[in-house]
C-alpha cells in the first residue's frame, strides 16, 4: 500500500514502486494527491501525470485524495462547496479536481 503526494514523492518513490512490481509484490496506491505531502502545496499536474501514466502502465489501482471542499490544494472541490448538492460540470471543482475528473474520464 502506498500514499503518494506528487510534488513530494517523485522519481525516488516511482523507482521503489517499479522495484516492488518487478518482484511480483502486490501494490495499491490507497491515496494520492496532486500537490505536496502537506496537502496544501502547489498543484503539480506534471508530476501527477507521470505518476498516473506509470500506475496505469503497471495496472496498479489508485484512489485520489481528497474529495472534499476544504480550502487546500489537494481538495477536489472549491472551498464552501456543499458536498450534498454537487452539480454536474466543473464549476465546483478546483484545478486538482478538474485534472482528476478529466484523467478518470479519459483513461
Language-model-derived ranges and their functions:
Residues 1, 5-61, 65-69, 74-106:
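Extracellular glycoside hydrolase catalytic/binding regions
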